[in-house]
Amino acid sequence: DRPWGTFEVLREQNNYKVKVLTVNPTEKLSLQYHRHRSEHWVVVEGTALVQIGDKEFTLNVNESTYVPAKQKHRLSNPSLEPLKVIEVQSGDYLGEDDIVRLEDVYRR
């Protein structure tokens, strides 16, 4: 569990990992980037507010986006319903410690 919700790893191989992220209502992940992996996000339930670089946009069910490695990004749930996102990570290192937090409301 995380302060913003939960994640479940569905499949993990050497060069990719597939997760389901559940972001609780009105919560957000840290503004962050990863050195070794890129991510694809597909919204399967709810509405996502996405920041990638200096751009911010909304994704609805069945919409997706790509987050390149080393690009700052944040996933938020602006609604009162849970947000579920399928995250596909790819890269040469997929450890949970490959994260640089630039801003974090939970002070991690």
Regions found by a protein language model. Give the residues of each.
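Short hydrophobic/aromatic-rich beta-strand segments that constitute the beta-sheet cores
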Residues: 30, 50-52, 75
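Double-stranded beta-helix
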Residues: 1-3, 74-108
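A short glycine-rich, His/Asp/Glu-containing loop-to-beta-strand
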Residues: 1-38, 93
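Glycine- and acidic-residue-biased ligand/ion/polar-headgroup-sensing regions
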Residues: 35-54
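A structural signal for the main folded, soluble domain(s) of proteins
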Residues: 10-11, 47, 74
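Short beta-strand segments
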Residues: 29, 55-57, 98
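A generic "binding-loop/recognition-motif" signal
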Residues: 25-27, 36-37, 55, 71-72, ...
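Short acidic-glycine-tyrosine-enriched beta hairpin
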Residues: 53-72
